[in-house]
């Protein structure tokens, strides 16, 4: 029985799908005006893990992760770069897809772009206006009337009085209430615009997800996810829009992953501790980064530090070391009655407890090192695959470069190993030791065995 921590109920609840055997999931994706940072990576990896677990349990999964390709930040960045919004967003969408693929994130069922669903957004805004839950302002904007939706604040646990007391921003004179939020923004010179019943303009951010979620998943679906920073106001506003428009529940389970911190400080550009996925992948293998993300429970804070990635690399090394030496070519059906598989399932069914699931893999690796049975290795790979891990050939994993230094490309390493073998055959041990030391200084570890010398690159030894 799967239990999910529902942010709306503030407790773990048994997952009961709206339709038996099917699950519909919507996750807020990127606003594409820059490269993915570690926070984006965490959202992508966490909910990739979630959908993989549902599929492993034979659910028919419809997974939607949107792309926000029209937004104030996008417009501002395009103006700064003196490029079109279309060129800017296309560039960063491609970069996002490359980063996601590197991290082993499977493509969602649907990845809608906001600009392709403006008609859906206009239609929903019209419903809200007709129901007196929204009002056109004199400047051409349309606002949601928060006080007219009785359930506002139920996701965040905030009352309207508390929210008003904490309001510090300059109040827009066109709003009836400081808490009202924009659904439609009147056109400004040089900005993209669409025709609407309220004049030309563009949609607000919050209405985008309500409209796209409904388009692909219906008015009522199972799970909505995203980062903890979106719980308020974005997700709170989505509930107000969708439930206000349709008069019934919008989503049954709300999931929020925790914040990312860097060296125990909030990640931010102003603190100079802001890293893109590409910057991190220049120093650490993609699978190490994925392992690092899943090593923490998705609701816990994720603290990034070089030493944490280095430790994750060493831990992943131990798992791959157990897989070395015995080839398993066929995928196996997981026997959930197996003691290790049963423990793994119990961990994952407890609100996707990946740290406990990984602990099972380490126990299984210990067993594999003792037995060397293909059956155990196949099970280890299959369980790892549920998390998107351990699918590489172990030898290739260990030989992946952690830098682009051509002096130690695989061909060069093999050449040096042959030179070392010749030196040893000639009893020139000084030269053999010199070559080993040279390779060690390049983070390349040699392993001499009965079948010859193999090598691997030490993971996680570079720093940002």
UniProtKB/Swiss-Prot annotation:
Zn(2+) binds at residues 28, 209, 234, 238. This is Cysteine--tRNA ligase. A motif ('HIGH' region) lies at residues 30-40. GO terms for molecular function: ATP binding; cysteine-tRNA ligase activity; zinc ion binding. It is an enzyme of class 6 (ligase). It comes from the Bacteria. InterPro entries: Cys-tRNA-ligase, Cys-tRNA-synt_Ia_DALR, Cys-tRNA/MSH_ligase, CysS_C, Rossmann-like_a/b/a_fold, tRNA-synt_1_cat_dom, tRNAsynth_Ia_anticodon-bd. Its main location: cytoplasm. One of its GO terms (biological process) is cysteinyl-tRNA aminoacylation. CDD domains: Anticodon_Ia_Cys, CysRS_core. Keywords: Aminoacyl-tRNA synthetase, ATP-binding, Cytoplasm, Ligase, Metal-binding, Nucleotide-binding, Protein biosynthesis, Zinc. Binds 1 zinc ion per subunit. Its cofactor is Zn(2+). The lineage of its organism: Bacteria, Pseudomonadati, Pseudomonadota, Betaproteobacteria, Nitrosomonadales. It holds the Pfam family tRNA-synt_1e. Its EC number is 6.1.1.16. One of its GO terms (cellular component) is cytosol. ATP binds at residue 269. It is found in: Cytoplasm. Monomer. It catalyses: tRNA(Cys) + L-cysteine + ATP = L-cysteinyl-tRNA(Cys) + AMP + diphosphate. Belongs to the class-I aminoacyl-tRNA synthetase family. A motif ('KMSKS' region) lies at residues 266-270.
């Amino acid at each position: 029985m799967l239990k999910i921590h529902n942010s709306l109920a503030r407790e773990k609840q048994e997952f009961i799908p709206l339709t038996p055997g099917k699950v519909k999931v919507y996750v807020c994706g990127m606003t594409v005006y820059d490269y993915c940072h570690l926070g984006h990576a965490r959202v992508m990896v966490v909910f990739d893990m979630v959908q993989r677990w549902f599929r492993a349990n034979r659910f028919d999964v419809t997974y939607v992760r949107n792309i926000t390709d029209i937004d104030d930040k996008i417009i501002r960045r395009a103006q700064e770069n003196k490029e079109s919004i279309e060129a800017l967003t296309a560039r960063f969408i491609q970069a996002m897809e490359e980063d996601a693929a590197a991290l082993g994130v499977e493509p969602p069922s649907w990845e809608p772009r906001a600009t392709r669903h403006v008609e859906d957004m206009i239609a929903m805004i019209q419903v809200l206006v007709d129901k007196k839950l929204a009002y056109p302002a004199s400047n051409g904007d349309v606002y949601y009337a928060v006080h007219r939706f009785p359930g506002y604040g139920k996701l965040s646990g905030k009352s309207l009085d508390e929210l008003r007391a904490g309001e510090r921003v300059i109040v827009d004179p066109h709003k009836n209430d400081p808490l009202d939020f924009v659904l439609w923004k009147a056109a400004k010179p040089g900005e993209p615009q669409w025709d609407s019943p309220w004049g030309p303009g563009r949609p607000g951010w919050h209405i985008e997800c309500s409209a796209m979620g409904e388009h692909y998943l219906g008015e009522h679906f199972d799970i909505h996810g995203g980062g903890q920073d979106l719980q308020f106001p974005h997700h709170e506003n989505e509930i107000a829009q969708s439930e206000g428009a349709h008069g019934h529940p919008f989503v049954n389970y709300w999931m929020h992953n925790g914040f990312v911190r860097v060296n125990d400080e909030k990640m931010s550009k102003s603190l100079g501790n802001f890293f893109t996925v590409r910057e991190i992948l220049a120093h650490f293998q993609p699978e190490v980064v994925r392992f690092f993300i899943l090593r923490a429970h998705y609701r816990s804070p994720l603290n990034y530090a070089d030493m944490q990635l280095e430790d994750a690399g060493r831990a992943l090394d131990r798992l791959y070391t157990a897989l070395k030496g015995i080839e398993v070519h066929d995928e196996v059906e997981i026997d959930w009655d197996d003691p290790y598989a049963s423990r793994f399932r119990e961990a994952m069914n407890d609100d996707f407890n990946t740290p406990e699931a990984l602990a099972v893999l380490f126990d299984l690796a210990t067993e594999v090192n003792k037995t060397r049975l293909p059956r155990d290795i196949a099970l280890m790979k299959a369980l790892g695959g549920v998390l998107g891990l351990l699918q590489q050939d172990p030898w290739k994993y260990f030989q992946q470069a952690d830098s682009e230094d051509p002096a130690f490309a695989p061909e060069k390493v093999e050449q040096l190993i042959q030179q070392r073998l010749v030196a040893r055959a000639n009893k020139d041990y000084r030269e053999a030791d010199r070559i080993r030391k040279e390779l060690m200084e390049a983070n390349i570890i040699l392993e001499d065995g009965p079948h010859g010398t193999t090598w691997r690159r030490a993971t996680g030894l570079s720093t940002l």
